């Protein structure tokens, strides 16, 4: 059992991530790991600033001492000049050191990022997904991987549609119309309009006088918004658009010039 376990571990090591890299890639990785961070330069800059600060402090103290213990015939110009020169050098070196430390910080940041990416690459497979790399660089969790199944095609007859699709399409098409009526307040302004509310399928093509009387008795003053809602509900319950019968079409054109001419005769 132990021999088999050792053989399995040796196979894993032989086929591990380190064996995926070529000779050139291994050389680049070794050079990246051996790069030393420029800490010596930072220490030298700090020592130089400390030395200039000591000189400035000594010059200012000497200027104060000479001013207190001033003797006749001695000028304070030389101590003042020395103090001003020391403070100026300290300021210039401080600005330069600040810029160098800023550049050094950027360089160290790049090196650390490269090392982190290389360490992450060593643990990954031979092929790295784009979203995994972007999520690692941005410090976020990669999105879940959904299995991309092929879309299913449903064949529907062009002359026949399902009631659900018909109702939803009609509802979607008439939604702007209903919103327009609600926004402009036509329900109250159009309440006095006469709307035909006869039952579907009733005979309407009759003589002139009886047709006129029946049309007057069948028309009622109803709210326009209520009428539209009832018609839409009736239309959706039937499962599709309804075609008007020839009798209804004849009722619509009763006021045509030909019909009026017959009445005149």
UniProtKB/Swiss-Prot annotation:
Transmembrane segments: none annotated. Keywords: Cytoplasm, Nucleus, Stress response. Residues 1-22, 145-170, 195-218, 240-265 are annotated as: Disordered. GO terms for cellular component: cytoplasm; nucleus. GO terms for biological process: negative regulation of signal transduction by p53 class mediator; regulation of cellular response to stress. Residues 156-170, 195-212 have a biased composition (Polar residues). It is found in: Nucleus; Cytoplasm. Pfam families: TAPR1-like. PANTHER family: CHROMOSOME 16 OPEN READING FRAME 72, UPF0472 PROTEIN C16ORF72. Acts as a central player within a network of stress response pathways promoting cellular adaptability. Functions as a negative regulator of TP53/P53 in the cellular response to telomere erosion and probably also DNA damage. Oligomer. Belongs to the TAPR1 family. This is HUWE1-associated protein modifying stress responses. It comes from Xenopus laevis.
